[in-house]
């Protein structure tokens, strides 16, 4: 994670006071020009007038890179930090820093838990299970240890077997990561029904029970880091204190809720950990002991622990009678603590990661690290959703807008000591917390698409159709939030019609005609069916990232296999640039005035995203032998999502172009019927 830069940054910044909050209105964020409203406030990237497109583009772009890595290099299995060639945009690893094995799994589970129901893309479950399975097979402590069969928190860079980072020692674990990873295993069990993940979660919980101690002001119930064999936390990189007992508590709470494992033990230890948390960190604000690659210090505070606690009690206010006060105070503490600097970037609050008042991580706000600001925005958005305080919605909106500039392969994102960046931040932790935006403020989701945005239960399966969504939840009792591109004619739970209501004080649904936001409460059934008139079947997309082809490759014949014939030499793969953060499509001949492709069997051409990187307006006219033409004009620097409105299949699609030499195309959308 971003903390790898802590030592390097500190060496240059020791004993140099910094302002707690400063304004940094730079013209670029992560190398991308800022986009502002009439008041000079930050708008999202890449489409400033379309929040839904920009936010959705962020999470889907990060997923495309995850899927590409799964299919090719699998670098995140072995490394934490990466750079890419600025010509080919091919990724390569940093060979020197710890691999963040444990909480990377937990963060990716949290991301995919939300992204899968948002898209219905079952490949996400394939990816996540394989990634977690690798840890279960190559990253657990041995039987017979004081901490048996639990995940190590880190590994040496490039190591195929995880046993901890040798810069800190050998054969050690971090108990809070055992809780965090254990919770992820448990939620993955709920997603898939595979009991090996349940058993892995129970092993984590049982180890936490076995090694619990009451704690005091200087000793937490579990150490921040200890040797796995005997549990000792003496000296050096080991340490007795971590404020992060919340993720072990989350694991206990969920096992207790579903009645699995040694529930009586979990209740007892959970109560002890909660009491300690209320008595010490929540009073003293000693928020230390999270990151896997720094040595413990009681003065080095971080924002992860207080914000993740605030998020948990906002989602589960029944756990904490003082949830409102605690969440508000912790948000304020993160934004005002003198331990590390905060920045105002065109009205967006940007937080760095950690610090002690003199030394901090990391560098200037428009270079890294998006995940921490994404977390702050998530908690503020959820606070707005629970309280209705509009000031928190506005703050979350501006901070989330800043986060969107880091999507894809952003050439200006880097550490303070080199061009590489952190996979954990940009492709796991950051996007999982941006997913909270849709749940908290459904109006920020795309208005012209249908998506399940959030549920109080894990969603186990989902299918999107024309004017329909069917899905199942792990729990029979749940409240679900969706945004639709159609109006529901009926909503049923296990075949029983739910009634229209003005609120969710009882089972039923509330539909907002103006925003098309649908909220459903079901108390006794898992299978939900939504049917309506109009709407469109979700299209299939060609992203030009899957399967991967090197930049500059001229398309010859079919790509992907059996879908489109691109002819011979009219089109080529382009690198991420302009307002596209991943690989895309361009003309092989910049002077061409026409180009075409053919479907292997007739398909409905829905449209494509087009960016004009030229200095003149470009005109794109699209037609086919079967269907009339449609045309659009793109100003210099403009990105448009072109939608044809065609309802009939085409055998081929022709593009007539004026000033088309700098056009880029991505996310080609089509339907089978």
Predicted regions and their residues:
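Low-complexity, Ser/Thr/Pro/Gly-enriched N-terminal "stalk/linker" regions
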Residues: 14-104, 122-168, 203, 207, ...
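C-terminal beta-sandwich/jelly-roll accessory domains of carbohydrate-active enzymes
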Residues: 444-538
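Terminal, low-complexity interaction segments
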Residues: 627-673
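N-terminal targeting leaders for non-cytosolic proteins
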Residues: 538-600, 623
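Structural helix-adjacent loops and short alpha-helical linkers that scaffold large soluble proteins
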Residues: 16-18, 42-60, 115-129, 188-202, ...
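Well-ordered alpha-helical segments within folded domains of soluble proteins
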Residues: 35-47, 93, 97-117, 170-190, ...
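Non-catalytic carbohydrate-binding regions of carbohydrate-active enzymes
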Residues: 65-73, 206-207, 211, 268-298, ...
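Extended extracellular/luminal ectodomain segments enriched in beta-structured repeat modules
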Residues: 477, 600-607, 650
């Amino acid at each position: 994670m971003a903390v790898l830069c802590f030592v390097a940054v500190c060496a240059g910044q020791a004993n140099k006071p910094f302002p707690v909050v400063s304004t940094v209105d730079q013209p670029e964020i992560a190398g991308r020009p800022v986009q502002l409203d009439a008041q000079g406030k930050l708008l999202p990237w890449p489409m400033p007038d379309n929040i839904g497109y920009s936010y959705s583009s962020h999470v889907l772009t990060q997923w495309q890179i995850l899927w590409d890595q799964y299919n090719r290099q699998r670098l995140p299995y072995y490394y934490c930090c990466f750079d890419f060639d600025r010509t080919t945009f091919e990724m390569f690893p940093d060979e020197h820093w710890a691999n963040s094995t444990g909480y990377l799994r937990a963060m990716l589970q949290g991301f995919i838990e939300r992204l899968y129901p948002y898209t219905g893309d079952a490949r996400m479950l394939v990816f996540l299970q394989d990634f977690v399975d690798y840890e279960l097979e190559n990253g657990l402590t041995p039987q017979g240890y004081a901490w048996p069969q639990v995940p190590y928190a880190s590994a040496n860079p490039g190591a195929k077997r995880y046993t901890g980072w040798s810069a800190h020692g050998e054969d050690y674990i971090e108990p809070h990561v055992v809780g965090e990873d254990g919770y992820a295993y448990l939620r993955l069990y709920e997603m898939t029904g595979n009991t090996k993940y349940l058993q892995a979660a129970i092993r984590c919980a049982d180890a936490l029970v076995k090694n619990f101690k009451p704690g005091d002001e200087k000793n937490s119930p579990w150490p921040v880091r200890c040797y796995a064999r005997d549990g000792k936390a003496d000296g050096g990189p080991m340490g007795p204190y971590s404020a992060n007992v919340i993720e072990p508590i989350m694991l206990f709470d969920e096992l207790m809720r579903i009645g699995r494992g040694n529930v009586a033990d979990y209740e007892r230890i959970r109560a002890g950990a909660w009491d300690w948390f209320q008595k010490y960190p929540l009073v003293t604000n000693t928020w230390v002991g999270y990151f896997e690659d720094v040595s413990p210090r009681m003065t080095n505070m971080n924002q992860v622990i207080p914000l993740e606690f605030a998020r948990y009690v906002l989602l589960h206010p029944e756990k904490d009678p003082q949830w409102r006060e605690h969440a508000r105070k912790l948000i304020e503490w993160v934004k005002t603590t003198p331990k590390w600097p905060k920045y105002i970037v065109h009205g967006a609050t940007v937080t760095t990661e950690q610090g002690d008042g003199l030394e901090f991580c990391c560098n200037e706000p428009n270079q890294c690290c998006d995940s921490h600001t994404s977390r702050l925005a998530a908690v503020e958005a959820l606070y707005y959703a629970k309280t209705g305080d509009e000031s928190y919605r506005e703050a979350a909106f501006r901070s989330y807008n800043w986060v969107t500039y880091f999507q894809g392969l952003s050439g200006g994102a880097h550490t303070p000591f080199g061009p590489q960046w952190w996979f954990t931040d940009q492709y796991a932790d950051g996007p999982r917390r941006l997913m909270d935006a849709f749940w908290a403020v459904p109006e920020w989701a795309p208005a012209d698409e249908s998506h399940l945005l959030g549920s109080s239960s894990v969603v186990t399966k989902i299918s999107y159709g024309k004017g329909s969504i069917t899905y199942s939840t792990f729990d029979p009792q749940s409240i679900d939030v969706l945004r639709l591109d159609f109006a529901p004619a009926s909503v049923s739970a296990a075949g029983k019609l739910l009634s229209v209501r003005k609120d969710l004080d009882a089972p039923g649904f509330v539909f907002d005609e103006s925003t098309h936001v649908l909220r459903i409460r079901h108390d006794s059934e898992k299978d939900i069916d939504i049917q309506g008139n109009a709407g469109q079947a979700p299209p299939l997309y060609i992203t030009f990232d899957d399967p991967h082809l090197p930049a500059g490759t001229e398309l010859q014949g079919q790509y992907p296999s059996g879908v489109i014939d691109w002819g011979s030499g009219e089109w080529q793969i382009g690198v991420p640039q302009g307002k596209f953060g991943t690989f895309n499509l361009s003309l092989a001949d910049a002077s061409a005035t026409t180009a075409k492709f053919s479907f292997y069997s007739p398909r409905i051409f829905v449209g494509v995203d087009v960016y004009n990187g030229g200095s003149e307006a470009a005109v794109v006219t699209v037609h086919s032998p079967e269907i009339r033409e449609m045309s659009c004009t793109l100003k210099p620097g403009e990105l448009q999502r072109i939608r044809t409105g065609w309802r009939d299949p085409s055998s081929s699609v022709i593009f007539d172009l004026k000033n088309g030499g700098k056009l880029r195309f991505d996310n080609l959308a089509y339907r089978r019927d």
